[in-house]
């Protein structure tokens, strides 16, 4: 089977290595627009339960990923000087770039061909592939070009948010509820490697409109939020990485596939950052897709409907959360 993956995120990488591992005769190519060893964002989160599901799929990547983890069991919520702690959850975080490097290294070892710095705006040159995996993210042109076929439904949520990092090492999933003269703010924070954390800040559109931050620079954002969170940050600081204010896009699709094209990861669905499940969903998509293909002996007419049947209930449940 000839497989082409458009986009080299966790969904495409994990699917490709699992597919090549179980079907070494398949020709699998991944095309990614970003340079090697470059990504947006900071960290990703997994639960202990999620990792058990990946252990059986490929132990080598499971071991490399879990060896890179920082672990925590608690959720801490701060509001008006009060702290509420909930324990016993079992979470782990790691650097997003490290995850991509682990998956890519394993995929290449197994024989997957990966090309970076490849910008694709049409799948026409790849129509000779038996299977095209659309894993090219939230703004996927593949999904947009076939909106009606996929039943694509993209809704931008009203709140504004910005994705930052911090040098502060959080020992729990931490949520801050702060208020200033402009309105209410929510901070979503977790450590992903020693001395480095994700720090997402969210507010209503009404609050944001009062700040004067519309169209601001990253430096303006850091200055404003460093003042807002000066007590929480202490001697630590905020870090940027394409940290622009935006509205969260909720992506759903009624149909997960069209002929020999299948959607995965953020192209197929998004999960709100407050529950930290986007990467989990993407990698679970990969496991479900290769399992369905192997069960069907590579027959897409059987495998792709089975893939949707497996994934849709879980995806819908997480999006409702």
Model-derived regions: residue spans:
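Short glycine-/acidic-enriched loop or helix-start segments at secondary-structure transitions
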Residues: 15, 40, 124-125, 142-145, ...
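Hydrophobic "anchor" residues on beta-strands that sit immediately upstream
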Residues: 3, 28, 113, 130-132, ...
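Glycine-rich FAD cofactor-binding loop and adjacent beta-loop-alpha segment at the N-terminus
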Residues: 2-72, 78-79, 88-98, 278
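Short, glycine/acidic-enriched loop or turn micro-motifs at the edges of active sites
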Residues: 35, 139, 269
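Short, well-ordered alpha-helices that flank and scaffold nucleotide-derived cofactor binding pockets
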Residues: 17-21, 105, 144-147, 291, ...
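Conserved mid-domain beta->alpha element of the FAD-binding
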Residues: 5-18, 133, 244-321
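Conserved FAD-binding catalytic core of PHBH/FMO-like flavoproteins
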Residues: 128-248, 252-253
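Conserved N-terminal helical subregion
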Residues: 48-163
């Amino acid at each position: 089977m000839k497989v082409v993956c458009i986009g080299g995120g966790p969904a495409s990488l994990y699917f490709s290595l699992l597919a090549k591992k179980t079907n070494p005769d398949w020709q699998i190519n991944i095309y990614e627009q970003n340079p090697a060893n470059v990504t947006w964002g900071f960290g990703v989160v997994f639960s202990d339960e999620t990792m058990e599901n990946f252990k059986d799929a490929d132990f080598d990547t499971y071991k490399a990923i879990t060896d890179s983890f920082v672990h925590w069991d608690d959720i801490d919520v701060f509001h008006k000087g009060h702290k509420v702690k909930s324990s016993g959850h079992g979470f782990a975080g790691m650097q997003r770039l490290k995850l991509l490097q682990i998956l890519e290294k394993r995929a290449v070892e197994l024989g997957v061909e990966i090309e970076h710095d490849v910008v694709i705006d049409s799948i026409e040159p790849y129509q000779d592939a038996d299977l095209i995996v659309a894993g090219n993210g939230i703004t996927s042109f593949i999904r947009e070009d076939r909106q009606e076929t996929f039943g694509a439904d993209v809704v931008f949520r009203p709140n504004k948010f910005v994705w930052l990092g911090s040098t502060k090492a959080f020992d729990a999933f931490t949520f801050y509820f702060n208020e200033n003269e402009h309105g209410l703010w929510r901070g979503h924070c977790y450590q992903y490697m020693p001395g480095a954390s994700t720090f997402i800040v969210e507010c209503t559109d009404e609050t944001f409109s009062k700040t004067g931050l519309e169209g601001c620079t990253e430096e303006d954002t850091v200055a404003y939020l460093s003042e807002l969170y000066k007590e929480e940050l202490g001697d630590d600081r905020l870090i940027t990485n394409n940290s622009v204010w935006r509205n969260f896009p909720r992506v759903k699709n009624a149909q997960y596939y069209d002929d020999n094209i299948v959607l995965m990861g953020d192209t197929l669905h998004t999960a709100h950052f407050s529950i930290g499940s986007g990467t989990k969903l993407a990698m679970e998509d990969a496991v479900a897709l290769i399992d369905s293909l192997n069960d069907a002996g590579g027959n897409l007419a059987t495998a792709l409907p089975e893939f949707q049947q497996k994934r849709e209930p879980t995806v819908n449940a997480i999006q409702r959360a």
